[in-house]
Every structure is written in C-alpha cells, then in structure tokens.
C-alpha cells in the first residue's frame, strides 16, 4: 500500500484519488476550497486544505491543478503555487526528522532505489514540456531547502481523461505515460500505476511524457477540425459527411497504419498527396469555401521541402522517410494503363 497525496481536487484530482483508494492505497486529497474539501469528506474521502507530510517517510504527491490557457499560453500559476506548498511540506517533514534529514548531502536521483525515504512529486496536470524540471523541481527545492535526489524526486505522468468519463478513464486507462530522469523513479511510479492496466510507456525524461500529452490533445483537435472542414464541403454538395468520415477512418493509411504516418522529418510527396491537396483547395474555393487547416497543411509541407535533407535528418534523429520508396509503394496502388 502506497501513501498518496493528490494536490488539486477538481475533476482530474478527484478521479485519481478515488481510483487509488479503490486500489487499496492510503490517499489524501488536498484542495484550497473548504467547501470542496467538506464535500469530499462527506463522500467518504480523506481531504484537507493543507498538505502535511510530517510523519510520512515517503509518498507520491500528484499535482492535478488546473492549467488554463490564455493569450499568453498556459497559466502555470497554480502549478507554481502547488509546487511551493509541496516544497514547504517536504521541508517541514525533513525538519521533523532532524538535522540529518535536513542537511543530507545531494545524491543523484538516478541512483535512488526502492525504499528510499523521499517524496516522489508527480506532475499529472497538462503542462508544456519542461514544466516539471524547470518549474516544479526548482520551486519544490527552494521551498523545501532540499535538493532533487535527496528530499524528493520528480516524474511526469500526464492525464488522458475525458470530462464525461474521468473516473472510468483512471480505472481503465487506454494509455499511461511516465517520464523521469531516473529509471528507478519511473519504474516505481509505473509499478504503482500498472495494476490499472492499459498500454504503459516509460520515458527517460519528464519532457517526453509532457510532449506526448500535448501532441495527443493537439492531434485529436486537428483531426476534429479536419472533419469539420470536410463537413462544410460535404454539406455544400449535399453529401452525408458521416458516411465519408466512417469510410475514410478504415481506409486511410494514417488510420489503418497509424505508426507509418507518425514519422517526422520529411514532407509528404508522391503523385497523389501533393496533387490532391492542391487540387482540393482549388475545388473548395470554387464552392466558396475556405479551408484554412488544409491550406496550412500544404504550407507546412512546402516549407519542409526547402531545407536540405541533412537538416531533416537532424530533425527526425536520422529517421528520414525514403521518398522514392514511398512513390514506389504508391505506384503499386495505381491501376495499370489500359
């Protein structure tokens, strides 16, 4: 049984807390709202307005605070505030254990093993890549008077929850992502999460896990906008957009073989993709419809054609799409001339 604290008891935090309780762990939810805390307590959960780690030699502390976006980007003030609170609580816990704990020498987080008396601070909120290491970690360190690897360790475990089914999405996740610079920290957190099932991916940096979550949401948003654009065209032509979407969902290479289309570093090419993108944009204009998303796709592709292949190889870490092979594969699908 693990000792778990969930800082931020909104939709995500409450769902996470309930799932851990059901899994048999000792869980305390922390929220600044007394009314919310009272409601949680009334529902049978342990909740408080102030994080207290005294008497806790080790724990998992999940940050599940809101990160709304505005004109200036993500608002990370709640993350910073929660990180300060976590740091203060860690500092108080170390002070209680005495000078030996408070002044322990810094140890590399990569060498920490199971059973060590530190607190694992886990960023569960959706944040831009770098937040865990550049904001959460330094803030906790300053507020606690301890160093990462001595009094606490860091990990990112972004949520993939839907508002209408948040609790079920925690109980039965399709995907769980863990990122930490320490392999042992990642494995400890993975061991805590593995019983929930689903595809579990471990990465060697919090930034990778954070970017996975951002890319996941943005990819979903892009596909929705794509079909909204296509629905405008279908509507203008009197065609049922649903029939088109459900058919393409099973036929397009990006859907039938997602891994094949997930390679980055080179533009799409061949006889069909470029031609159809340009041609359909012109067709939509004839219908009096703008297609800004498709137009942006074409624009990005043209920009990628310009850099030398060496630059693309660097961007893709050596994985450059073999354009000639792509054209050969495409040719195999074209009917023979008659």
For the regions a protein language model found, what residue spans apply to each?
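Internal alpha-helical scaffold of NAD(P)-dependent oxidoreductase catalytic cores
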Residues: 138-157, 162, 166-256, 283-289, ...
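NAD(P)-dependent Rossmann-like dehydrogenase/reductase catalytic/cofactor-binding core
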Residues: 235-338
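Local beta-strand N-terminus motif with an aromatic residue
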Residues: 57-58, 118, 173
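NAD(P)+-binding Rossmann beta1-loop-alpha1 motif at the extreme N-terminus of oxidoreductases
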Residues: 1-52, 56, 60, 322, ...
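Short, well-ordered coil/turn residues at beta-beta hairpins
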Residues: 63-65, 124-125, 179
């Amino acid at each position: 049984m693990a000792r778990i604290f969930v800082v931020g008891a909104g939709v995500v935090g409450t769902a996470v807390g309930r799932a851990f309780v059901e899994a048999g762990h000792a869980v305390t939810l922390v929220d600044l709202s007394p009314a919310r805390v009272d409601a949680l307590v009334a529902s049978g959960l342990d909740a408080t307005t102030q994080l207290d780690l005294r008497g806790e030699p080790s724990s998992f502390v999940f940050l599940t605070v809101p990160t709304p976006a505005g004109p200036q980007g993500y608002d990370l003030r709640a993350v910073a505030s929660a990180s300060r609170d976590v740091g203060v609580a860690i500092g108080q816990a170390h002070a209680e254990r005495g000078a030996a704990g408070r002044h322990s020498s810094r140890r590399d987080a990569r060498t920490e093993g199971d059973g060590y008396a530190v607190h694992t601070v886990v960023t569960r909120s959706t944040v831009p890549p770098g937040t865990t290491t550049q904001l959460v970690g330094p803030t906790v360190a300053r507020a606690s008077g301890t160093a990462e690897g001595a009094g606490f360790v860091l990990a990112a475990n972004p949520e993939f929850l839907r508002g209408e089914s948040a609790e079920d999405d925690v109980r039965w996740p399709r995907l769980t992502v863990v990122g930490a610079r320490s392999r042992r920290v990642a494995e400890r957190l993975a061991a805590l999460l593995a019983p929930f099932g689903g595809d579990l991916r471990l990465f060697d940096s919090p930034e990778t896990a954070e970017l996975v979550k951002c890319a996941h949401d943005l990819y979903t948003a892009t596909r929705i906008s794509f079909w909204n654009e296509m629905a405008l065209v279908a509507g203008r032509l009197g065609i049922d957009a649903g029939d088109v979407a459900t058919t393409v969902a099973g036929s397009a290479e990006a859907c039938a073989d997602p891994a094949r289309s997930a390679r980055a570093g080179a533009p799409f090419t061949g006889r069909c993709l470029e031609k159809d993108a340009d041609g359909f944009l012109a067709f939509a204009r004839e219908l009096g419809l703008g297609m800004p998303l498709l137009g942006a796709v074409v624009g990005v592709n043209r920009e990628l054609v310009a850099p030398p292949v060496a630059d693309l190889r660097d961007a893709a870490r050596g994985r450059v799409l073999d354009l000639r092979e792509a054209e050969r594969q495409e040719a195999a699908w074209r009917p023979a001339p008659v």
